[in-house]
Structures are given as structure tokens and as C-alpha cells.
Amino acid sequence: DFSAPAKTKTGWQEAEEIAKKFHIQDINFVKPGIGETTRVLLRRMPWKILVRDKKDTEYIGHILKLAEEKSVAVEEYPLQTYRACGLIRDLHADV
């Protein structure tokens, strides 16, 4: 049936799924997109960086370099809407 719209995941849905998978209580600690991920690495307390493909250096090369400089883990994750997603460390969470 081609009359039904294709079911695609929205960016918001993907961010919510990431928050749930990584037990992040505040959705504001999930920063999807190349720009937001870069900002997390430059101005925030990053916990982990998720990338669709570590070999995608044309788009995320600077993210990989910043993560290495700051000793932040980079994990390949099956992102569908974004190439990268920064996860911010919750300084108030019980670890």
C-alpha cells in the first residue's frame, strides 16, 4: 500500500530513544547534530560522543580530534537522522 506515508524516525524521536538507552533523565543532555556535538566538546562537560560512522571524517573529523584531545569516548551507534550526537555528563546524577 503506497498510499500510507512512509514511517521515518524524526530527530526528536531519535534523541528520546538515545536518552532512554543511555539512562539520561534530562533530554537536554542529548545534543544531536554535528554543530551541537561540536559545541558539547568545546563548551560543555561531555560524557560520550555517538557517531554513525567513525570513517566519515569529511563531516566528523574535527569531532573525533576534539574527543581525542579531551579523552571523551566515541562510540559508533546506528544513528538514522544525525551523523553525530553529544551526550553531556550529568554532574548531579548518582553514578
Language-model features: where?
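Generic structural signal for short, solvent-exposed loop/turn connectors between secondary structure elements
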Residues: 22-28, 52, 75-84
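Glutamate identity and glutamate-enriched acidic tracts
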Residues: 14-17, 36, 58, 68-69, ...
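Ribosome large-subunit tunnel/peptidyl-transferase-proximal elements
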Residues: 1-45
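Acidic-enriched, low-complexity/disordered segments with a strong bias for Aspartate over Glutamate
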Residues: 1, 26, 53-56, 90, ...
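Extracellular/luminal Protease-associated
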Residues: 28, 32, 41-60, 64
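Short basic, glycine-rich beta-strand/loop surfaces that mediate nucleic-acid
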Residues: 61-95
